[in-house]
A protein has these predicted regions:
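Active-site metal-binding loops of divalent metal-dependent hydrolases
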Residues: 44, 199, 293
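Short beta-strand scaffold segments in enzyme catalytic cores
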Residues: 76, 124-128, 265-268
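Conserved beta-alpha-beta core of the PfkB/ribokinase-like small-molecule kinase fold
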Residues: 165-248, 263-266
């Protein structure tokens, strides 16, 4: 397949909102040789997940702590395939924010575009684990998540333009100033190949479905790849049937439309190809990170220029591996792990 090519505090190498205007000149002159393979933009937080399955939160005895947030998880997943990755986001000026930075550095993700916001807390997310398909999430993002404070003037538009993959999620469109920052970033990309929108719609982050549909529609005018499940496609283009949804996304101008269908697998369409790949069947422990694992592997396959069917099989397998593990970000597989699973599937 070929796709047409507030006052804040500085922590580590994170930029603060107070300093953003001062450093803007240097931030918009990222040298080509420093370009990233993947830049994601959007949610970050700390996942506090149970270490017992089938138990409600009030009865859980032990928890694990890991970095979370869909856009951040995708950057982590892509870094597992030895790509140069970075995430554009914001944390609180608090211990969890400092943890996020240290953990991302440990996991090989650049924190160059992360700043902390005074007066707001780093988001925390709890979940319950009831395999195979019930994983209630409890988001603590009030009064406002720092990652929704990304501003236009803070963006390194040169880096965003130069990166091979620019990945965003629709949550970043839910509130200002993040909403406008995302639209400016899309305009800077100017429909460059591999400008990807994850249709990751979460109703609790939006004032109404109608507002979400409007903002996603604006974004679709600028992206070249759209990825979502049937429910997310309904918000984006008013269709739940996978084929009609993919066609509607293509009509909006994207070059590659991917519709995830859960146990029925995944459908992908371009102007010239229609590919359906069955689900990679696993014993699910926690399915919450599988979509982000799919996303990071999708970035990898597209960067490598693989045929579309191989990209989808690899991404499906990666997502399946994540679903067999308790956590999300630290559950992302390596290329060798994914290839081993694919090889094993050939002999089943």
């Amino acid at each position: 397949m070929t796709l047409s090519q507030n006052r804040c505090t500085l922590i580590g190498n994170r930029r603060s909102a107070h300093d953003e205007e001062v450093v803007q000149t240097s931030m918009t002159q990222t040298p080509e040789h420093h370009a990233f393979d993947v830049i994601t933009m959007g949610r970050v937080g700390v996942d506090i997940y149970p270490q017992q399955a089938g138990v409600p939160l009030e009865e859980v005895e032990t928890f694990s702590k890991s970095v979370g947030g869909s856009a951040t998880n995708v950057a982590i997943a892509a870094s597992r395939y030895e790509h140069r990755t970075a995430v554009v986001t914001r944390t609180g000026n608090d211990p969890f924010g400092r943890y996020v930075v240290k953990e991302l550095e440990r996991l090989g993700v650049s924190t160059k575009f992360i700043a902390s916001v005074d007066g707001l807390n780093t988001p925390v997310t709890f979940c319950e684990i009831f395999p195979p398909d019930d994983f209630p999430l409890y988001f603590y993002r009030a009064p406002k998540a720092p990652d929704l404070m990304i501003s236009v003037k803070s963006l390194d538009l040169a880096a965003i333009e130069q990166t091979k993959v620019f990945w965003t999620t629709v949550t970043g469109l839910s509130e200002e100033p993040s909403r406008q920052a995302h639209h400016v970033a899309y305009q800077a990309r100017a429909r460059r190949p591999l400008t990807i929108l994850d249709l990751d719609y979460r109703p609790m982050f939006w004032s109404s479905p109608e507002v979400a549909t409007r903002e996603v529609g604006r974004a679709l005018e600028h992206v070249t790849v759209a990825v979502g499940n049937r429910e997310e496609c309904e918000i984006a283009v008013g269709e739940t049937d996978p084929h009609r949804a993919a066609d509607a996304l293509l009509e909006r101008g994207v070059e590659l439309a991917i519709v995830k269908q859960g146990p029925r697998g995944v459908l992908a369409k371009t102007a010239d190809e229609t590919i359906e790949v069955p689900a990679h069947l696993v014993t699910v422990i926690n399915g919450l990170g599988s979509g982000d694992g799919f996303g990071g592997a999708l970035c990898h396959g597209l960067i490598e220029g693989w045929p579309l069917e191989r990209v989808l099989r690899f991404a499906n397998a990666a997502g399946g591996i994540v679903a067999t593990r308790f956590e999300c970000s630290t559950a992302m597989p390596t290329s060798a792990e994914v290839e081993a699973v694919l090889e094993e599937a050939l002999h089943v």
